[in-house]
Each structure stands twice: as structure tokens, then as C-alpha cells.
Swiss-Prot record:
Location, primary (coarse class): cytoplasm
Residue ranges annotated for the Guanylate kinase-like domain, each copy included: 3-181
Endpoints of the signal sequence: none
The reaction(s) this protein catalyses: GMP + ATP = GDP + ADP
CDD domains: GMPK (cd00071)
UniProt organism field: Xylella fastidiosa (strain 9a5c)
Keyword Lyase (UniProt): no
Highest taxon of source: Bacteria
Family: Belongs to the guanylate kinase family.
GO cellular component, one term: cytosol
Record InterPro entries: GK/Ca_channel_bsu, Guanylate_kin-like_dom, Guanylate_kinase, Guanylate_kinase_CS, P-loop_NTPase
PROSITE patterns recorded: GUANYLATE_KINASE_1, GUANYLATE_KINASE_2
The name this protein goes by in its record: Guanylate kinase
Keyword Ribosomal protein attached: no
Length: 204
């Protein structure tokens, strides 16, 4: 059975990565795809763990070579997902999660219409700005640039299947877990996963 592709997007500072990481710690059936980026790593980030960090020139070479399943320019830096991180895993029956922006999500949905997409919103603009400043990872210039892009990013929430409001962290994690569980219980999924049982039950 082919795996399920999940897409999670949010405006910068919404807590997307924290929610995704906490959810995947509880759910070992989904693999997080590691994205490529042309930006410099932050102090707490590690190559091949948080991102594959490459130069802007190398990223452009990968674009020209057709290596990316999706890619986009996000806050003046390139980000993208390699084909090899997605298609082989899905074909092998593994569920894959892409943590990407709305531009990349739109590209992915055009290629895989049945991908399940989730958008995370903050409880308020003030909370979003507070989180961006508290994480202490970006300069004031970068924070201002990210805040300026917030409205456009959040305006795309209605392109996604599910919306989670990250007001209380544990609630948001539980809601994401519930989406994954509900996906596995869909009739078309259960029909394939339990084909022998269903065939036996329905045989006169």
C-alpha cells in the first residue's frame, strides 16, 4: 500500500517545528522529510538533522538538475524538498511529512492531490511576535522581515485541509495526532490494509 503524504505549513514563529517534532515523537509511523536550504544555520541547528545546508549556487544547480520535488524562495532564502526524500518512501508504503511553506505546499498538492495538508495559526499577532523574539534565533532585521510577511503567509490557510490554532501547545500536538489517526481510519485506507479480514467477513 502506498504511503500517505502529509504537509504542515505555518507562518514563521507559529511553533510549527515544535508541534511537528513533539507529534512525531509519539507517532513512529511517519518520517519527517529533511529540507534543503540556502540560508546559514542558526546556532542550535545541525546539518542533515534540521536541514541540509547548501550554498545558494549549489541550490541553483539542484534546481537546474531537476532534483527538487518542490522548492520556493522563503524570506530571501531558498528551501526545497528533494525527490529522493519523498517518492521512494511513499512507493515503499511509508508515510512522509513535509514541513514546508505555502508556496511549496501548493506545488505538492498539484503533484499529489490526495496529500493531507495542515496549516497552523497563532492565537494572535501579539503572540506570534512574542514567540519570534523569545526564540532568540534571528536578528531584529530578520524579525521585522518575517513579521511583514506574516499576513500574506496566513492568508493561505484556507488552501489546506485542516487548521490548528496553537494557543495551547499540548492541545495542538493532540490535534495533529488526531488528524494522523483519522487519516489511517479512512475507508479507502482500511480497505487496503485489512483486505483479507474484510474479504473474510463479507464472504457468505
Amino acid at each position: 500500500m502506498r504511503g500517505t503524504l502529509y504537509i504542515v505549513s505555518a507562518a514563521s514563529g507559529t511553533g510549527k517545528s515544535s508541534i511537528v517534532n513533539a507529534t512525531l515523537e509519539r507517532d513512529q509511523q511517519i518520517a519527517l522529510s529533511i529540507s534543503f536550504t540556502s540560508r546559514q544555520p542558526r546556532p542550535n541547528e545541525r546539518h542533515a538533522q534540521h536541514y541540509y545546508f547548501v550554498s545558494a549556487d549549489e541550490f541553483q544547480r539542484m534546481i537546474e538538475a531537476g532534483d527538487f520535488f518542490e522548492y520556493a524562495l522563503v524570506h530571501d532564502d531558498w528551501k526545497g524538498t528533494a525527490h529522493q526524500s519523498v517518492e521512494p518512501q511513499l512507493a515503499a508504503g511509508h508515510d512522509v511529512l513535509l514541513e514546508i511553506d505555502w508556496q511549496g505546499a501548493r506545488q505538492v498538492r498539484n503533484k499529489i492531490p490526495d496529500a493531507i495538508s495542515i496549516f497552523i495559526l497563532p492565537p494572535s499577532r501579539a503572540a506570534l511576535e512574542e514567540r519570534l523574539r523569545k526564540r532568540g534565533q534571528d536578528s531584529e532585521e530578520v524579525i521585522h522581515r518575517r513579521l511583514a510577511a506574516v499576513h500574506e503567509e496566513m492568508a493561505h490557510y484556507d488552501e489546506f485541509d485542516y487548521t490548528i490554532i496553537n494557543e495551547h501547545f499540548e492541545t495542538a500536538v493532540s490535534e495533529m495526532s488526531a488528524i494522523f489517526t483519522a487519516s489511517r481510519l479512512r475507508r479507502q485506507t482500511q480497505k487496503v490494509r485489512h483486505a483479507n479480514l474484510i474479504r473474510t467477513l463479507l464472504t457468505p
